[in-house]
Design a protein with these regions (language model features):
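Short acidic-glycine-tyrosine-enriched beta hairpin
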Residues: 81-98
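Ligand-binding loop in jelly-roll beta-barrel domains
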Residues: 71, 98-119
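Glycine- and acidic-residue-biased ligand/ion/polar-headgroup-sensing regions
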Residues: 61-80
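A short glycine-rich, His/Asp/Glu-containing loop-to-beta-strand
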Residues: 30-55, 66, 116
Length: 120
C-alpha cells in the first residue's frame, strides 16, 4: 500500500512538472504572439509581435539573441514577481541569458522582435 501511494505521488509530481514545463514554452502559452520561422537541432527562431498593451504570460527561454525590428517600452516580471522596465530600440541586438518571465508591451504601438533561442 505504501509503495503504490509513493508511486502515485511521484507520478503526480512528474505530471505536474511536465505540464508546467510545457506551459512555459512561449509558443504554447502565446501562439498568436510567437511564430516559429525556423527550428533545428541548434536553434529555434521566433518572430514575436506584442500589440500595444498586450501581455505574454509567464514563459521561459534558453540563452537567446533578440533582434529588435520595431522597438518599444516593456515591463517584464520574473518568477519572484520583480518587475523590470525596459525600452528596446529599433535595430538593437542583444544576448539574453536563459530566463523565465512574463512580459507586457507598455507602449502605444506594436513591438516586433526576432528571438533566436540557442539549443546547444
Amino acid at each position: 500500500m505504501k509503495t503504490s501511494m509513493a508511486a502515485a505521488t511521484v507520478l503526480g509530481a512528474c505530471l505536474l512538472l511536465a505540464g508546467k514545463a510545457n506551459a512555459q514554452d512561449p509558443v504554447k502559452v502565446a501562439p498568436t504572439m510567437n511564430k516559429v520561422v525556423l527550428e533545428n537541432e541548434r536553434v529555434r527562431v521566433l518572430d514575436v509581435t506584442l500589440k500595444a498593451g498586450q501581455q505574454m504570460p509567464m514563459h521561459q527561454h534558453p540563452d537567446n539573441i533578440v533582434y529588435v525590428i520595431k522597438g518599444g517600452k516593456t515591463r517584464a516580471v520574473n518568477l519572484q514577481g520583480v518587475p523590470t522596465d525596459r525600452e528596446f530600440k529599433d535595430g538593437e541586438c542583444t544576448f539574453r541569458p536563459a530566463e523565465t518571465h512574463a512580459i507586457q508591451n507598455t507602449d502605444t504601438h506594436d513591438l516586433h522582435v526576432i528571438n533566436v533561442e540557442l539549443k546547444k
